[in-house]
Amino acid sequence: MRSLSLAWLLGGITLLAASASCNRTVNAPGPNSKGRSLIGRLDTPPPITGKGAPVEPGFSVDEFSASVLTGKLTTVFLPVIYIIVFVIGLPSNGMALWVFFFRTKKKHPAVIYMANLALADLLSVIWFPLKISYHLHGNDWTYGDALCKVLIGFFYGNMYCSILFMTCLSVQRYWVIVNPMGHSRKRANIAVGVSLAIWLLIFLVTIPLYVMRQTIYIPALNITTCHDVLPEEVLVGDMFSYFLSLAIGVFLFPALLTASAYVLMIKTLRSSAMDEHSEKKRRRAIRLIITVLSMYFICFAPSNVLLVVHYFLIKSQRQSHVYALYLVALCLSTLNSCIDPFVYYFVSKDFRDQARNALLCRSVRTVKRMQISLTSNKFSRKSSSYSSSSTSVKTSY
């Protein structure tokens, strides 16, 4: 549990540092700032060049939005956290995916869901260098609108993909506890089907992010933002309905299902009769369940709640001061990509063994030889003890 404790400590440090950065950022504009959280307004109609091609229109932002885009919160704090997540998340999820696909022979439903969860985390983390570069260059996107769409689509898509696979994993764990005699192959086939359905669902729900324009040029700051500034009519209309639907359908319902599964799991474990050795395992399982459930809500709940609040404020009051906090919460949600591999390590004994063998550069053939040797040694000890006991019985007669 030490690794999970370190992850919690990292999350706490993130929150404290982010709170200080948010306070400095919000207070920068002064008391007269209207604070319309990254709403872009078209300055003038785009001029026409001599060739008849319109020049890219420029958008203006208010003082609060300018302070967020130029402040240390987005240009220093966020890239530092994303660098940490990238450095830890890329190798750990890559190794986890390799263990699940190439080192684990028995593809149980839990292994299938964890492999898909590792894949979702990996697909999210591999795009972080672009996001880090964007923030380090003062929130100036230089890679084109198409690549910005891909970055945003993968970022949000894989976040909600992780939520759904964690929900499937929690429901599957509860089902194994209440129905341990089920057919494993049938369960594995169901898990594969559910996984494919989740990937298809995530692709469909992220299509709007690939269709709409994500880059906005701001002449006053001489930067081109990626998703951080959008036209007011888009924020009030399409994006409000879109993200509200995502928050309810792809976060709220799975969160309630996950919480229910874990609560029922804890009740079932506590009510079951066990010996002293099994009691220790049960307590460890309950602690792990509480840790995973807390991680689930701490990583994903703040960003989804603040996102809904942000769009509600924009729609009702045409202003919002919570976008800076939302950026912090969204950054906090990426810590899940660092924590998940350690959760695999504590949840699955098979993953622990295979990961340890992989780190020690032991091939599958070497591991088999070690297992055969260990089994033969145990058998020889039992045989020798049986023969010695038989000899002692004969001599006594």
From Swiss-Prot:
The record marks 36-37 as: Cleavage. One of its GO terms (molecular function) is G-protein beta-subunit binding. Residues 26-36 form a propeptide. GO terms for biological process: blood coagulation; cell-cell junction maintenance; defense response to virus; establishment of endothelial barrier; G protein-coupled receptor signaling pathway; inflammatory response; innate immune response; leukocyte migration. Disulfide bonds join 148-226. Residues 1-25 form the signal peptide. This is Proteinase-activated receptor 2.
